[in-house]
Amino acid sequence: MVQLAKVPILGNDIIHVGYNIHDHLVETIIKHCPSSTYVICNDTNLSKVPYYQQLVLEFKASLPEGSRLLTYVVKPGETSKSRETKAQLEDYLLVEGCTRDTVMIAIGGGVIGDMIGFVASTFMRGVRVVQVPTSLLAMVDSSIGGKTAIDTPLGKNFIGAFWQPKFVLVDIKWLETLAKREFINGMAEVIKTACIWNADEFTRLESNASLFLNVVNGAKNVKVTNQLTNEIDEISNTDIEAMLDHTYKLVLESIKVKAEVVSSDERESSLRNLLNFGHSIGHAYEAILTPQALHGECVSIGMVKEAELSRYFGILSPTQVARLSKILVAYGLPVSPDEKWFKELTLHKKTPLDILLKKMSIDKKNEGSKKKVVILESIGKCYGDSAQFVSDEDLRFILTDETLVYPFKDIPADQQKVVIPPGSKSISNRALIIAALGEGQCKIKNLLHSDDTKHMLTAVHELKGATISWEDNGETVVVEGHGGSTLSACADPLYLGNAGTASRFLTSLAALVNSTPSQKYIVLTGNARMQQRPIAPLVDSLRANGTKIEYLNNEGSLPIKVYTDSVFKGGRIELAATVSSQYVSSILMCAPYAEEPVTLALVGGKPISKLYVDMTIKMMEKFGINVETSTTEPYTYYIPKGHYINPSEYVIESDASSATYPLAFAAMTGTTVTVPNIGFESLQGDARFARDVLKPMGCKITQTATSTTVSGPPVGTLKPLKHVDMEPMTDAFLTACVVAAISHDSDPNSANTTTIEGIANQRVKECNRILAMATELAKFGVKTTELPDGIQVHGLNSIKDLKVPSDSSGPVGVCTYDDHRVAMSFSLLAGMVNSQNERDEVANPVRILERHCTGKTWPGWWDVLHSELGAKLDGAEPLECTSKKNSKKSVVIIGMRAAGKTTISKWCASALGYKLVDLDELFEQQHNNQSVKQFVVENGWEKFREEETRIFKEVIQNYGDDGYVFSTGGGIVESAESRKALKDFASSGGYVLHLHRDIEETIVFLQSDPSRPAYVEEIREVWNRREEWYKECSNFSFFAPHCSAEAEFQALRRSFSKYIATITGVREIEIPSGRSAFVCLTFDDLTEQTENLTPICYGCEAVEVRVDHLANYSADFVSKQLSILRKATDSIPIIFTVRTKKQGGNFPDEEFKTLRELYDIALKNGVEFLDLELTLPTDIQYEVINKRGNTKIIGSHHDFQGLYSWDDAEWENRFNQALTLDVDVVKFVGTAVNFEDNLRLEHFRDTHKNKPLIAVNMTSKGSISRVLNNVLTPVTSDLLPNSAAPGQLTVAQINKMYTSMGGIEPKELFVVGKPIGHSRSPILHNTGYEILGLPHKFDKFETESAQLVKEKLLDGNKNFGGAAVTIPLKLDIMQYMDELTDAAKVIGAVNTVIPLGNKKFKGDNTDWLGIRNALINNGVPEYVGHTAGLVIGAGGTSRAALYALHSLGCKKIFIINRTTSKLKPLIESLPSEFNIIGIESTKSIEEIKEHVGVAVSCVPADKPLDDELLSKLERFLVKGAHAAFAPTLLEAAYKPSVTPVMTISQDKYQWHVVPGSQMLVHQGVAQFEKWTGFKAPFKAIFDAVTKE
């Protein structure tokens, strides 16, 4: 056990730290703070902790006579830290008669400590307070120093006071019940205090990180009996005693630092703001990412950013930054907002640069507008005694991954700099492998601290190859080698990022690893690019030598599985080394540990980069193994058996490849740079770059055995290099390229060409570097020629010819391809652009993307370029990549034959305005029109699959972002390579849509189709095999049932068009803002309910599918139910709900696997809303939230048992949880035990308005809550077998009750005009009012006078609710409108008057909506961009028709009329973007190339067509044959029901015709919805209007 420690602060030993010190806590408070009243304050979460209960009971038992103990419990969470809670507590204290001798005892985390401390500072002008912190963060930070505060709506901690506690009693035992994430969160402050003040403690923290994380990750939830209430509570439990010493020390040491700083600067005038290290930037991130991200997580990111800022200023060494980053990761904290797990946790929120800087401007350390940041000098020490001023320019650079490089204008020609690059990556990685295999201790100095070596160190540690520690404040790594004897297989895959060197070296090392009882193999893996880079030659050699290795994905690349029960035999090993010398070095280094001496023969041609092989051999010699080169056989080496003996110290030479950048800077800017630790004796081939490349180009070179100095010629006088073989220094070719770009001859006939060869291996590095250089140099205006093993760079005649990379839309970035060498090379060329312009001339900077990729070999490169070499840099908000700016992600449709892919692909292309490509047809085009069937007969299925995969990968690469629909063959998923390509496309944001239907229907169809190649097996077997593949490859799914009638076919098309528009974001899912409802279905199968589904949904904005009520949960069954519902209800938005038993439903509580599958079905089916229970496991919740796409999430919580009143903390906690999850809608359902529960609910509703909230009470006593709920009220229907919850009402019942309460005012509405005796408007609207229970009345007001309408209705009827305007008043009424909609203005007529209140009216026109919606309802897509439109007639209705066709996306609209002279004035009166073409002659129609697929007839219907007009019409009707959908004509007249135009269109030209009655009803329904705000019961209205 640990000892009780007392830490002084402000001269008093008031901070007590120990473990299990409840006795001491009670005794200290009662003895040293005598009082008549003690008040323990905590939140409801702490009340569940047994240790708290024990403490309260003990405190009560120990009270002296005359004293009392009060307890006050608040709701948990930051929302309790408010003025309201403070006032409630103060009122409680007053009511209880508390006086000035009261002692407040704050037991809890930071929220409790801050708020109770503030109450104590103001109550009775100040009473005593004792802090008992229970979270790690509170123990080491908020409880110490006397800062107290509450939050306001405008910001956190804005109102508070300094009020020092009488005691801070820190009991480590509280941490046993701290949640894992909160525990890790607190470590950020612990690491921070060590970082700024205590280097020894920082080192101790480093060495105990794995212990900490193992214990914290082992926390379990346990059920406990509450000693105060006897209820069963569930709490987290961590085995603190397993790391008690470490935890005690980390808490104590962190407290000591804060106490010392506070004692020196209580009121935070200078020194105390050092405690804000990481907070300036961290708080800015927290302001954006709250509540998803915790304080410590944001401070962790802030510390790394602020440390990088210090490194940027040249103050902090790169090693120290690497140490800080490493320890934060080791304790489970984020170091970047872009980490995958952290992005998922914060729900992919963006952190815009301007917002971060704005948030940073609100910081107490700032002075006015000047920002201040704490700068670190080294681990354990800050720079100066307080925060330092920092410019926005420097902050922008640090906060972004895109850097702006300004012209190198202000760099003096006589500048001389000394630059020491980081240690060589090549030597660092070799040294770590050899020292780990060696025996004894080796201190490695100048090790490169980069991503590559970090992965290598991690791997050596995980494989137990050596014991690794650090000295010299982390600058020296100490490797205690075990001679290879302890190498053991690890269970987790070794992730190597994009570290090619590490991956190759570790592949051979893996052959030496021993199995453990539980682990017989290891897995090496990496990022996406690493999984493309070659490793096959090395694997082939090791396999041939007895090591069993499997590829887990792509043949020839990582990931690989190396079996550790096989052995590395030795003997003769043959290896192809023409691609990478690292294969050779990998085997060389491990060869001494083979069972036999090794003869390594390099075969297949001249090995690449032989100098690196020589480097390896020389290093092995330093560690005691001598490699002999064969004198009889070329490229062959003899390696004896043996063990490396580690030298006591090994100093790693600086990286010669990295050294080329500062040396090239000198060459290009005419300055001088010295690299003091690389000379001609270097082991590295790139050391000759200065001598062999820069010297012939005109530079002065001074090179000794250990140093290199380059002085560049005057700017602009570098000479091209006619030819250079860079095979000995291939990595340096990129640097040579950018130097060559500004090199030119004085000879006017010269092409200024520099030719570089010997670099073929650079095509398979981090990227294809040769292609990358050619592509990016072109952006600067520099031409190149790619060679088989090199590149030619055609230098510019003048540096002034260099261009800022840009395209037609403006500047673009230089892509770095996640390649450190590409980034560093172009950072030099970027600074030369405009560098020779006049000094006062404004010069645009060059943008470099992904600057952090330099972390692979030189994390501090940008710091050197800025601080040492004098470059001006800035940061910038990322541009939308040019490729993404206009990106229209393509759609790939997969599925079995006969699933409807061909038809639905056409619908998809039409709906989205995309181009359609059938891959089977493309296959035939590429194979001389040979059919798939013929090709399979001649070449077999395997060859066909290869070709199919090739074609698919090509089209995705070339057109994946360009708006295509690709219809694939049914068997595309048979190929593993195709499956990977499909999944990759889906993960990159593409749409892979699995189209499926009932397998029985598919079988029947396929057995009767002779045009397709025969299956070699039963269709059902094929489906059984492919079903899972289709699911895993697709990110969306659509069930397309067989259609037996045209009406079904049209309904399916509408359903699909809305579906594809929803999943692609073309159709936005809107959450209703006004009164709205959704109906809860309770059927177990919708198949037999299709007729009822439409009336069931009357008046509703959405329909809930209670999946837990369905007959079964199979994917096919559930998808079919969704399809039936969409077709039957014309795609009313679906709420997908799986209600668990404990939340009042039927779904088993613990069936999480099935639940996940159901949610996956929902999201793939693009449901508009998904109900997510807030009681589900967190991992399921985050999985759904991060995969939601365009689906809106309803976070729900139900209290069926009536356990919680609406003022209980449960609801507040759940609401905060919903905010943290960032759900779109919150749904809370309580149980009304009495009427007052409804009043409490309304108070809750009124105080929780920051998210749309559905809040209702169940039972008949809660009915009023359903009436008062505003958004998406759950309702039932008389047509349902039962309601989904007790007390549910129908829409009509709710409206009637709401009317009786004064919520809906009865309105009088009219149709106005003359004659209106036969008007169907009253029947239309009154039918809707009756069905929905609305109190309104619609009547006729017959008049020819607009003036009379104004006097009697607009001005004279106080209950006036709106008017439908017909002839002759559509123009006359406009003068009395205060506003006109765009439609009314353009159409030039008003058919709808909408009251705005205060005697103001808006004029609208819904005729165009009647036309548009009638067309869409009859199979016309919502977007018809590839089809022209036609309007027949030029009267008043034609204007609405033209407006409607334009809204559908018709790029061109033709218009014909009996009197052609009327066309021109009509066209001129409408917007030019309508692109209306008036047709004057029949002949001109023949020249029209467009397909015409949609038409509106606006001519009188009661007489025959004029012959000339009929002739024009018929010529247009012919053009409907090739439309992308069934050509459709709408008749605007509704009497007679069949007109001459309809007859000729349908009977002679097979156009689909829509009668005028549909337009009439659709325009009336649009009016209904505008006047009432309710969704109209369309079918019932249509039947009523048309029943005559």
From Swiss-Prot:
Region annotation (3-dehydroquinase) ranges: 1081-1293
Region (3-dehydroquinate synthase): 1-392
Molecular function GO labels: 3-dehydroquinate dehydratase activity; 3-dehydroquinate synthase activity; 3-phosphoshikimate 1-carboxyvinyltransferase activity; ATP binding; metal ion binding; shikimate 3-dehydrogenase (NADP+) activity; shikimate kinase activity
GO biological process: amino acid biosynthetic process; aromatic amino acid family biosynthetic process; chorismate biosynthetic process
Pathway the protein contributes to: Metabolic intermediate biosynthesis; chorismate biosynthesis; chorismate from D-erythrose 4-phosphate and phosphoenolpyruvate: step 2/7; Metabolic intermediate biosynthesis; chorismate biosynthesis; chorismate from D-erythrose 4-phosphate and phosphoenolpyruvate: step 3/7; Metabolic intermediate biosynthesis; chorismate biosynthesis; chorismate from D-erythrose 4-phosphate and phosphoenolpyruvate: step 4/7; Metabolic intermediate biosynthesis; chorismate biosynthesis; chorismate from D-erythrose 4-phosphate and phosphoenolpyruvate: step 5/7
Functional summary from the UniProt entry: The AROM polypeptide catalyzes 5 consecutive enzymatic reactions in prechorismate polyaromatic amino acid biosynthesis.
Positions annotated as active site in the UniProt record: 268, 283, 853, 1198, 1227
Binding-site residues, NAD(+): 43-45, 78-81, 109-111, 114, 134-135, 156, 174-177, 185
Name of the protein: Pentafunctional AROM polypeptide
The protein's assembly and partners: Homodimer.
Region (Shikimate dehydrogenase): 1306-1588
Names of required cofactors: Zn(2+)
CDD domains: DHQase_I, DHQS, EPSP_synthase, NAD_bind_Shikimate_DH, SK
Region Shikimate kinase: start-end pairs: 890-1080
Residues where Zn(2+) binds: 189, 279, 295
Recorded catalytic activity of this chain's protein: 7-phospho-2-dehydro-3-deoxy-D-arabino-heptonate = 3-dehydroquinate + phosphate; 3-dehydroquinate = 3-dehydroshikimate + H2O; shikimate + NADP(+) = 3-dehydroshikimate + NADPH + H(+); shikimate + ATP = 3-phosphoshikimate + ADP + H(+)
PANTHER family documented for this protein: AROM/DEHYDROQUINATE SYNTHASE, PENTAFUNCTIONAL AROM POLYPEPTIDE
Family membership noted in the UniProt record: In the N-terminal section; belongs to the sugar phosphate cyclases superfamily. Dehydroquinate synthase family.
Location of region: EPSP synthase: 405-871
Gene3D superfamilies xref list: 3.40.50.1970, Aldolase class I (3.20.20.70), Dehydroquinate synthase-like - alpha domain (1.20.1090.10), Enolpyruvate transferase domain (3.65.10.10), Leucine Dehydrogenase, chain A, domain 1 (3.40.50.10860), NAD(P)-binding Rossmann-like Domain (3.40.50.720), P-loop containing nucleotide triphosphate hydrolases (3.40.50.300)
Transmembrane domains' residue ranges: none
Gene Ontology CC, one term: cytoplasm
EC assignment: 4.2.3.4, 2.5.1.19, 2.7.1.71, 4.2.1.10
